């Protein structure tokens, strides 16, 4: 008798009720950002490799033994994971006039994906489209990045916390038309539009409008926490809006399991919606569409005691 049968059966039922996709996925993607391959490399993610579809291997510099990079890449690819260096490396290569060497490096090491971004603001849209085509012609899967980290020179934004929906959609569609397989929507924009405390109602409306204008199989929402702000509420907000198979990127390796729990509605975010829906399915067609609490109850905005209910 398989003593793990009950766990497998429960897991299968959770996947079914959440309509969760399996690898190789075209939607429901989780991309993991590796900024420390020595401590959070292949061995760390191996136990839950089925949850990870792509890796952004940011950590390419300042290693005592540079072979760690090639070994990690080989291990990731054997797990069925697409691997790209960070868009940072593309911008460095471009700034130093070394794109041809960069392409050779990617091929020699076995990267199968590249990210085209323009945080330095030195490229026109036409140049970005040409770069997408160049890397596609070289046999890479290509992801184009939408927007920039800082709003002051980002043509898709009108302020730190709001965008031009029209210009954002236009940029995304141009990158897709040029051949980009996916679009990463810059994480600082996604965070600003949702609001670190889920407070930016106008920005949320804009984010939904953009998402509804782009093929959901193409757009991947980046999230990152470089300012040490929590990501879990933002994961939950995106899953509530777009379902468990929303594409998410820049997930830290230690957050992958928590994200998967949120994708299945079995954690505190949104007040354990799967439990509530399982008990009373008249609440909605699926657990992520049922009523959720007002996050003012939980998130610490100028924390003070609240009146009792």
Regions found by a protein language model. Name each.
Residues 2-73:
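Conserved N-terminal beta1-alpha1 strand-loop-helix module at the mouth
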Residues 25-40, 58-63, 84-98, 121, ...:
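Active-site mouth loops of central-metabolism enzymes
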């Amino acid at each position: 008798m398989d003593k793990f049968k009950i766990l497998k059966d429960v897991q299968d039922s959770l996947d079914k009720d959440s309509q969760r996709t399996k690898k190789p996925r075209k939607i429901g993607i989780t991309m993991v950002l590796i900024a420390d391959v020595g401590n959070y490399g292949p061995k760390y993610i191996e136990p839950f490799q089925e949850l990870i579809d792509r890796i952004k291997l940011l950590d390419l510099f300042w290693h005592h033994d540079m072979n760690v990079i090639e070994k990690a890449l080989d291990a990731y690819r054997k797990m069925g994971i697409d691997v790209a260096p960070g868009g940072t490396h593309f911008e460095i290569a471009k700034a130093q006039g070394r794109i041809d060497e960069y392409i050779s490096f990617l091929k020699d090491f076995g990267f199968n994906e590249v990210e085209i971004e323009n945080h330095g603001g030195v490229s026109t849209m036409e140049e970005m489209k040409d770069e997408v085509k160049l890397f596609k012609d070289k046999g890479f899967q290509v992801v184009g990045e939408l927007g920039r980290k800082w709003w002051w020179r980002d043509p898709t934004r009108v302020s730190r916390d709001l965008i031009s929906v029209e210009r954002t959609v236009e940029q995304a569609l141009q990158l897709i038309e040029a051949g980009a397989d996916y679009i990463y929507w810059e994480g600082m924009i996604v965070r600003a539009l949702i609001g670190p405390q889920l407070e930016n109602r106008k920005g949320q409306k804009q984010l939904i409008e953009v998402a509804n204008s782009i093929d959901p199989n193409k757009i991947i929402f980046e999230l990152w926490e470089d300012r040490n702000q929590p990501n879990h509420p933002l994961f939950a907000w995106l899953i509530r809006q777009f379902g468990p198979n929303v594409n998410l990127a820049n997930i830290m390796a230690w957050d992958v399991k928590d994200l998967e729990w949120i994708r299945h509605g079995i954690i505190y975010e949104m007040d354990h919606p799967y439990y509530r829906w399982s008990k009373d399915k008249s609440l909605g067609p699926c657990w992520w569409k049922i009523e959720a609490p007002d996050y003012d109850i939980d998130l610490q905005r100028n924390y003070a005691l609240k009146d009792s209910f």
